[in-house]
């Protein structure tokens, strides 16, 4: 049986050495290991937790290490991060287990010289009451450390929205995100789906104010449950659902979803259309088109044509559409609670986004029929991902 802590440390090292997506890496590793369901749940919580709180954890390591952070063994750093996270944020883990298992990881990863260092730092942190000292930090730096958010992003939030809103946003950026799903109205109703989920011991409730939306509580490996496999729902954030409702497609229309993968928005659009009409779901990467096709098949949706297409370049083979959804590539800073690695990008990583977004918007506008509708959406809190010049649509 695989060791969940060792699995997590190896995944974290992979994240540090590549540009892997946390969710895809986790799915890949879990599919190839023999972890029990309980160990998978623990490993997922620890993995995402360390990514989310990395800046805070590194601050603690730096404050308690006589060795400069940059000179520490990378494996020892990951072990310390996981150990400290368990001590601070996982009440179910005994302190002794957090320490002892961390020391064992040093042996398993052959960083023998770090055993005493790891053991000493974790035990010293416990003796100190597991307190984090913010003494002497400037307000922006303290917020950055407390909520594990890069200083440049903290300062930008304060500058654009004020301190009160920035603090609320930072608080909302950490912690376990809720899981929402869209009821597949082609197959069932909200009431019937909730009853079916209850039979499988999955707690869920209707989300107030948004028809056919439910909130799942502790869903676990939701893709393995029978209602999911039967295509009774698909997982989709509220913001994504609202994009589709704003577009307001109806039966027998022609609709384009120009940046569609993995397909959640297209599925909701198809359901709103009653599975009648034409819906073109496109993505730049051919391998992601398969995700759309698989999801549509599971949900019983037949009106979707999934295809590879570069949304920034006009495709004369596409039809004129009644409605176009333009959910452009963006910084993703509005969803960092789900993808915590995003906030550790540098500002320069987003430099090319506005131009790409403008090209996609300008191209998408050319597909809209006279009197048609185009909805443009982006998942960003700060002014990185917005077109910087006006677009005139005739």
Residue ranges and their predicted role:
Residues 1-389:
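S-adenosylmethionine
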Residues 393-394:
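Hydrophobic alpha-helical segments, chiefly the membrane-spanning helices
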